[in-house]
């Protein structure tokens, strides 16, 4: 719904929005400029990458996570419904390659002050939080922030890391 001071103003507003949605032009440094379709493409575009964020249906996540780990990246895996057998295998790959796998089903991380997933803007400080529960980690981080204590890292590992089967 567009509300404007007249039909001409409304039409102009709609035209601007439509142009923005269909434009192939990008400005250097914008999010639209960097949208790799694969792990390999992302690394070709920027070989300094260290973390891959994976958010696909759980059925497809293991393939992408494994590609990222085998490419030397740490992984933030937002995807849920990843079969537990795949999660165990991926955790083993991460350990053997000395990479960090956050998730699957990891909703929150703050790495060197950069939020991934659902995260709050926090003052920087000396505290690091590692938790299975992203909601719990955010609550602790926000309480620390409100108390004037900054947080440098918040790492969610995913809820199944605490189970005997995965942990």
Q: What is the predicted function of each stretch?
A:
Residues 1-167:
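Catalytic-core regions of core metabolic enzymes
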